[in-house]
């Protein structure tokens, strides 16, 4: 999140045609809930374009990149690596340690699509489970980011937005942002 050590989400194992919507939602969730960047492994140019379009319209900063070497990103990461998996340690048991690690350096969050190679489990500093039950990787990422930032990301100011959502009790309203 802007003003803190970098948080990057790595979408590992994107399968074209099968994972387009889910990969897009991983990126949009990362953006909305405080990450600085998403790196997508695989041929996901449609997801990249959609996430960039939302960032252009609703603000950032947020970066999207495609990578052909995701395992090198994990291996060479100069910070804490967190792998979200239902088999990991309970989030409530490790979240304070991860927040402490984030206070002193960047965090890479690995979110798998297909079966994650075992070396990712071994290279991760933390394998973290959100409920240790099968569910959506998007839900796991959202809960993890909220726990990492302790809700601070919900009050974030969006830079360079063309439009903004106006909160309403009922109905919906999106309005242009006036540059002053």
From Swiss-Prot:
Swiss-Prot/TrEMBL keywords: Cytoplasm, Methyltransferase, S-adenosyl-L-methionine, Transferase, tRNA processing
Top EC group: transferase
Enzyme Commission number(s) from the entry: 2.1.1.206
GO molecular function: tRNA (cytidine(56)-2'-O)-methyltransferase activity
Keyword Ribonucleoprotein: no
Source species of the chain: Natronomonas pharaonis (strain ATCC 35678 / DSM 2160 / CIP 103997 / JCM 8858 / NBRC 14720 / NCIMB 2260 / Gabara)
GO cellular component entries: cytoplasm
Annotated InterPro entries: Alpha/beta_knot_MTases, tRNA_m1G_MTases_N, tRNA_mtfrase_aTrm56
Gene3D superfamilies reported in the protein's UniProt record: 3.40.1280.10
Annotated localization: Cytoplasm
Chain residues that bind S-adenosyl-L-methionine: 84, 112-116
Assembly with partners or alone: Homodimer.
Function: Specifically catalyzes the AdoMet-dependent 2'-O-ribose methylation of cytidine at position 56 in tRNAs.
Recorded family membership: Belongs to the aTrm56 family.
Main location: cytoplasm
Matches recorded under SUPFAM superfamilies: alpha/beta knot
Catalyzed reactions per annotation: cytidine(56) in tRNA + S-adenosyl-L-methionine = 2'-O-methylcytidine(56) in tRNA + S-adenosyl-L-homocysteine + H(+)
One of the GO biological process terms: tRNA nucleoside ribose methylation
Protein name, entry field: tRNA (cytidine(56)-2'-O)-methyltransferase
